[in-house]
């Protein structure tokens, strides 16, 4: 009888297969997981673009975050104590569609020294609605200041969950969503946003103010990487919902384009 071709002569199983109790292998074990598929796609797109898989091109500027605590403490010192923090802000189009086509917009917010000197906090915000349901949905936008930017998925803040968002304080005319017009708007005057949080099903609660500053002399495909899973605070972090898929996609996108370590300022 010919030898069983599914098992090598020494009785071991090839490393890409999983042995079942009867000695056979399970083909399902070789199928990529959701996180694996997301990672492969993100790495492939980032390698082709030599830019992030999503939000590939953006406008970067300095900003100032002023935290003004109100109401009950959150259980996170960064939000419970007044303070001012230097910020690097990157405004971008999500898919990178050309021209003035509607596209979801993103704000990548890097807060310096949020948990003491040398610490980093990254928040990734996407244009969304403000209602109890629409605040969780990415919304394409023609006017960059027409509505809020939220984390879409909740954060664990102290002992509770809440969504984080910035709401534009609109004092200027329509800002079209092209990179050129975004750059011009930031260059023309400081743009202000109210930083807010909302527990599930509840109203927004003010946390402070984010104000844009001078533009950075960085190319639109700036390779600085933002990662809210690596750069977080002890008592402020993304919840576990979709965390495996998102972490895998962020890491693969960095590998695909050869980005710098997101833990470096």
What are these regions (language model features)?
Residues 2-6, 20-265:
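Active-site-adjacent core segments of small-molecule enzymes
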Residues 8-10, 14-19:
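Long tandem-repeat architecture
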């Amino acid at each position: 009888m010919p030898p069983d071709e599914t098992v090598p002569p020494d009785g071991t199983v090839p490393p890409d297969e999983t042995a079942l109790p009867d000695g056979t292998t399970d083909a399902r074990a070789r199928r990529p997981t959701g996180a694996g598929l997301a990672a492969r796609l993100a790495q492939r797109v980032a390698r082709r673009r030599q830019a992030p898989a999503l939000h590939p091109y953006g406008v970067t500027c300095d900003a100032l975050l002023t935290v003004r605590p109100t109401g009950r403490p959150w259980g996170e010192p960064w939000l419970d104590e007044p303070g001012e923090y230097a910020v690097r802000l990157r405004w971008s189009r999500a898919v990178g569609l050309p021209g003035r086509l509607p596209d979801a917009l993103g704000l990548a917010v890097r807060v310096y020294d949020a948990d003491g000197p040398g610490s980093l906090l990254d928040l990734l915000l996407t244009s969304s609605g403000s209602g109890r349901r629409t605040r969780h949905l990415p919304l394409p936008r023609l006017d960059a200041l027409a509505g809020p930017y939220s984390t879409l998925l909740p954060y664990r803040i102290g002992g509770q969950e809440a969504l984080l968002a910035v709401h534009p304080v609109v004092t200027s005319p329509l800002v079209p969503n092209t990179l050129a017009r975004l750059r011009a708007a930031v260059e023309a005057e400081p743009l202000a946003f109210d930083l807010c949080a909302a527990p599930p099903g509840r109203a927004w609660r003010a946390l402070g103010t984010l104000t844009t500053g001078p533009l950075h002399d960085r190319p639109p495909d700036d390779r600085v990487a933002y990662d809210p899973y690596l750069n977080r605070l002890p008592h402020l972090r993304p919840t576990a919902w979709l965390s495996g898929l998102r972490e895998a996609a962020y890491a693969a996108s960095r590998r695909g384009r050869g980005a710098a370590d997101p833990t470096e300022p």
